[in-house]
């Protein structure tokens, strides 16, 4: 079990998929949202949560005031858990896309997101992560000023962000490393 830390749904317990996911710890989630809230007001934001797992990161954003959250998860069992967790949080504005992240972001987006959170399995290669980051820009999922949060293993090298992203911060929390970057666009 994990829980929503703060906001309208603070304290509500969330289910976690039985296998195949690595939920972000409460400590890391709190640090991540502190770093985000120091840079952007979550109120009214559109958030894209990639490799959503239990949905805890995206639902935390919703609880803290995000207007709309899209949670992308390829595993059908995990997507079902996310749907149940949306019911538990009982806030409007959450949508689940049960599909592979690479397939979703390789197509055009109907909107640019203010925040993108990507927590891929540690086994996902750096090249695959960079490809996803590149597709986010090319297909208009992100725009100038979008903040991108990436969770990776603290044992792996820091991400080499593709053109169009400016790294802001990277910090290790035990086994996890949180990296933040801002999108400045390919035309800058």
Where are these regions (language model features)?
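Class I S-adenosyl-L-methionine-dependent methyltransferase catalytic core
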Residues: 1-188
């Amino acid at each position: 079990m994990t829980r929503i830390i703060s906001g309208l749904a603070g304290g509500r317990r969330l289910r976690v998929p039985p296998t195949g996911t690595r939920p972000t710890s409460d400590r890391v989630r709190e640090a991540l949202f502190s770093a985000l809230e120091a840079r952007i007001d979550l109120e009214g934001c559109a958030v894209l949560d990639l490799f959503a797992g239990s949905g805890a990161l995206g639902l935390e954003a919703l609880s803290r005031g995000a207007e709309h959250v899209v949670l992308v998860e390829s595993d059908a069992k995990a997507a079902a858990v996310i749907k149940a967790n949306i019911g538990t949080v009982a806030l409007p504005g959450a949508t689940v896309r049960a599909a592979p992240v690479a397939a979703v972001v390789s197509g055009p987006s109907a909107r640019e997101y203010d925040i993108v959170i990507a927590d891929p399995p540690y086994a996902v290669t750096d090249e695959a992560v960079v490809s996803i980051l590149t597709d986010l820009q090319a297909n208009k999922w992100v725009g100038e000023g979008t903040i991108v949060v990436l969770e990776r293993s603290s044992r792996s090298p820091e991400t080499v962000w593709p053109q169009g992203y400016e790294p802001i911060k990277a910090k290790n929390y035990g086994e996890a490393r949180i990296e933040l970057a801002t999108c400045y666009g390919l035309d800058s």
